[in-house]
Structure formats: structure tokens, C-alpha cells
């Protein structure tokens, strides 16, 4: 079986690394020693789980042998059958655990996140829902122990946002938010509606892993940086100094604007973070498109134009269309209670990846 062969191969590699780490020539080479140590550490839990799995198989074989030798001893046979049932359950759990450990890890999972929320169809109502979603993610971040900071925003007169960009910092931020990319649809009676009719609006969410400098090098010659006075809702000037920053990446035409800070330097630093994340995301999207076939069964396509979720206020309903999950607890979700949705999406994604793994893909 392909999975067993993979586990045996990893066990052999673990033993090799153990020998390398005991070799004085490796110890004297700090770079190689660090690389081997990390690989050894990553393999340690997998190998330990595989050894435990083999031990259960051995116990099961011994129990079968005991059952065969029990003869007419009813008490012995009953005891062996009970032990066998317990071991079979343990084996099943062990197998699931091993399969999950073998799933390729997303290298972005522990990264910070650039969160971008933009109003789509629906005008002012869509802009207000941008504000609602930002509040939801802020409370979810608080529950998870993450820090959220607004980097840039474009406010409207009624308190909504045409666009909002924020940084979410904390362990597992990308892992917890990566399934949020896509179109979020809201159905409710807008505050501006006098006839009591339900309107449908849409908001687009993009979740980008923060780019490390080592992953992405941007040449100064590829940037055009413009500074100007920041403006508020309606276009009125809110600052008397040239603190707003617009950075254009000339090779791609990507433009990032930051004006929320009073300091030009802070706005520039924030704009660079957003630009780096967008460029890294563009690289990864291009790479992902080459692996599109392998991603078909996974949760959503990650396509920003994909409608992923509907928030229906009259029915207090949240529906995630990718996994056909419906919850009648809209208020709880908007208060940051996203865990149930995220857990269901994660489980679905893992199940589809396990199906590929089991098929030897």
C-alpha cells in the first residue's frame, strides 16, 4: 500500500538523520546541522505514530492467536473478542491520525494575514456590510488571541467602507482565515430602504499570507512612490501634510494606497506590506493554477469571484455554499463565532485531501 511504503520511507530517513546528527562533521557545520535538526524534528511525531500503529497491529495479531488457541474456553474467547474489538477501534483511530499527519502542510498556515474587504454590488448597503464583516473578523481574531490592525480604508458617509485593508497577526492566522476568500452575499432590509424590501448585496474578501522578505525581493527601480494629502469621506482633505502614500509596482501595474496614519513613513511601511503580500499571492495563484486538477476536490477554488457564503438576516441564516452548511445563528457568527464554520471547512478540506492521498495521488 502506498501510504505504508511512504511511512517506511520516512522511518528510514529519520534513522539516517539521527546518524547524521551524531556525526561530528555535521555538528561542525551549523547550517547543515540546523537543516537536519529541523527535518528530524518534523519527522519525529510521524515516526512515533507509525511505531505506535505497528505495535497495535502486533497486539491484534497476538489477540487473534489467543482467540484461535482458546478452544472451548468460553471465558478466554470472550476476553479475546473484547480485546480484539478495542484494538480494532484503536487501529482505526491510529490510521486516521497517520493519514492526517501525512497530508502536505500549507507553508502559509502559521503566517500573518493581509485581510482585504471590498464592497461589490449593492452600493451603500454593501459598504455597510464591509464594516460588519470587519467587526466579525475582529472579534474572531480576539477570540483566537490574534492582533488585528487596520492598514488602509476608504470610508463612506453612512459609516461603511468601499474598501478596507487590515493586518491580522498571530499563530495560525492564515490557517484560520484562508477559507474566507471569495464573495460574501448579504440579504437584508437596508437602513436606507423605506418600503421594507429585502435587498441582496455582495462583498469580496481576500486573504493574503504576509510575504517574508526572503520570499520576495522588490527592486527599488520597479516602484513609483507618490505622496499627497489624505482625504476622508466625500473627498474632503483631512490632513495638512503630504502623508498619504501611493505605491505603484511598475512591472505588474499593482497600486496600493495607504493614508490612515498621520505619518508618511508609517503609511509607506504599511503600503509596502500590502504590496508584498499581493505580489506573493499573485505568484502563488499562478503556481496553483498549474495544479488546478489536484485542487478540484478541495474547499472552493480560492477564486475571489466564487460566491462562498450567504448571510440572510430575515431568517437569521448563514449558508456556506461550498460544503452546503447552513446555521441558523447569524448573530452568533457576526459576533465572531466563526469556529463552527471554519472547523467544518477544515474537516471537508482534509477529507478531500485524504481521498487523494489514499488514491496514491
UniProtKB/Swiss-Prot annotation:
Q: Which Pfam families match?
A: PCRF, RF-1
Question: Known post-translational modifications?
Answer: Methylated by PrmC. Methylation increases the termination efficiency of RF1.
InterPro entries annotated for this entry? PCRF, Pep_chain_release_fac_I, Pep_chain_release_fac_I_sf, Prokaryotic/Mito_RF, RF-1
Q: Name one GO molecular function term.
A: translation release factor activity, codon specific
Enumerate the SUPFAM superfamilies for this protein: Release factor (SSF75620)
Entry superkingdom: Bacteria
Compartments where located: Cytoplasm
Where does this protein chiefly localize? cytoplasm
In this UniProt entry, the residues modified to N5-methylglutamine are 236
Provide the alphabetized UniProt keywords: Cytoplasm, Methylation, Protein biosynthesis
> Can you cite an annotated GO cellular component?
cytoplasm
Record region (Disordered)? 286-306
Q: State what this protein does.
A: Peptide chain release factor 1 directs the termination of translation in response to the peptide chain termination codons UAG and UAA.
Instruction: Give the family per the record.
Output: Belongs to the prokaryotic/mitochondrial release factor family.
Annotated protein name in UniProt? Peptide chain release factor 1
Source species: Magnetococcus marinus (strain ATCC BAA-1437 / JCM 17883 / MC-1)
Amino acid at each position: 500500500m502506498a501510504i505504508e511504503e511512504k511511512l517506511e520511507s520516512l522511518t528510514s530517513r529519520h534513522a539516517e538523520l539521527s546518524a547524521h546528527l551524531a556525526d561530528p562533521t555535521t555538528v561542525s557545520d551549523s547550517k547543515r546541522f540546523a537543516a537536519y535538526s529541523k527535518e528530524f524534528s518534523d519527522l519525529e511525531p510521524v515516526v512515533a505514530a507509525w511505531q505506535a500503529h505497528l505495535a497495535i497491529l502486533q497486539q491484534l495479531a497476538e489477540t487473534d492467536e489467543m482467540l484461535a488457541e482458546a478452544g472451548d474456553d468460553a471465558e478466554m474467547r470472550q476476553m479475546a473478542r473484547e480485546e480484539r474489538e478495542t484494538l480494532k477501534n484503536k487501529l482505526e483511530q491510529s490510521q486516521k491520525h497517520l493519514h492526517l499527519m501525512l497530508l502536505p502542510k500549507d507553508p502559509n498556515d502559521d503566517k500573518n494575514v493581509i485581510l482585504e474587504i471590498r464592497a461589490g454590488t449593492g452600493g451603500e448597503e454593501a459598504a455597510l456590510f464591509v464594516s460588519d464583516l470587519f467587526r466579525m473578523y475582529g472579534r474572531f481574531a480576539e477570540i483566537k488571541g490574534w492582533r488585528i490592525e487596520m492598514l488602509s480604508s476608504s470610508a463612506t458617509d453612512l459609516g461603511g467602507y468601499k474598501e478596507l485593508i487590515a493586518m491580522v497577526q498571530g499563530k495560525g492566522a492564515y490557517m484560520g482565515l484562508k477559507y474566507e476568500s471569495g464573495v460574501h452575499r448579504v440579504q437584508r432590509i437596508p437602513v436606507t430602504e423605506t418600503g421594507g424590501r429585502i435587498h441582496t448585496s455582495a462583498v469580496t474578501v481576500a486573504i493574503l499570507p504576509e510575504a517574508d522578505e526572503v520570499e520576495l525581493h522588490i527592486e527599488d527601480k520597479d516602484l513609483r512612490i507618490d505622496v499627497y494629502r489624505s482625504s476622508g469621506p466625500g473627498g474632503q482633505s483631512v490632513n495638512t501634510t503630504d502623508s498619504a502614500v501611493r505605491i505603484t509596482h511598475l512591472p505588474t501595474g499593482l497600486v496600493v494606497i495607504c493614508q490612515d496614519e498621520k505619518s508618511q513613513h508609517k503609511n509607506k511601511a504599511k503600503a509596502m506590506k500590502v504590496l508584498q503580500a499581493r505580489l506573493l499571492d499573485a505568484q502563488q495563484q499562478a503556481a496553483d493554477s498549474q495544479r488546478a486538477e489536484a485542487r478540484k476536490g478541495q474547499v472552493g477554488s480560492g477564486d475571489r469571484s466564487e460566491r462562498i457564503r450567504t448571510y440572510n438576516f430575515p431568517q437569521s441564516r448563514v449558508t456556506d455554499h461550498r460544503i452546503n452548511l447552513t446555521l441558523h445563528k447569524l448573530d452568533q457568527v457576526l459576533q465572531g463565532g466563526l469556529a463552527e464554520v471554519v472547523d467544518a471547512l477544515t474537516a471537508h478540506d482534509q477529507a478531500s485531501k485524504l481521498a487523494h492521498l489514499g488514491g496514491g495521488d
